[in-house]
Amino acid sequence: LLASESCALDIVGATVVRDVEPGEMLIIDKNGIRSEMPFQQVAPRFCVFEYVYFSRPDSIVEGRGVYHARKAIGGELASESHIDADLIIPVPDSGVPAALGYAEKSGVPFDLGIIRNHYVGRTFIQPTQKGRTDSVKLKHNANPAAVKGKRIVLVDDSIVRGTTSRKIVTMMRNAGAAEVHMRIASPPTTHPCFYG
């Protein structure tokens, strides 16, 4: 059984044996399974976005649990960029582990100030700006009871286009937050990645 993420193997009760190496082909046929490396070997180009966003939190990437990596990044973010606040709020769902790590490290309470509609997909891949903006409106809704009058820190995993961030900040202000601060758990995405 082969899968792109370890969590798929967990779900069916399979055991993770090893990762498929960059450029490797695993051939499974009537004679069994064999590995071939038909391409010139190059240095691996690990995509940091696997830890930040793409992988499911319950997967293992390069021997490390994605959830724990994201939570540790949030803790580091709190150490580097602390601000006095009343509440730490994740941008769901991908911002949750980093926000938990931020809250634990800072000692500021964690709460769900944004409720996510799980029937709306990834907003940053919509082909038009209007589509992205409309998707954000459908995907997230404020929880005014949690944020009204509070100084909040929003924690998200990344910013690709900024559409979600702008809308979420406005949403929190409209819900009555006294202050809205944004913390991002990864460096800015400024250029495309050509490594796949």
Regions flagged by a language model, labelled:
Residues 1-196:
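PRPP-associated nucleotide enzymes
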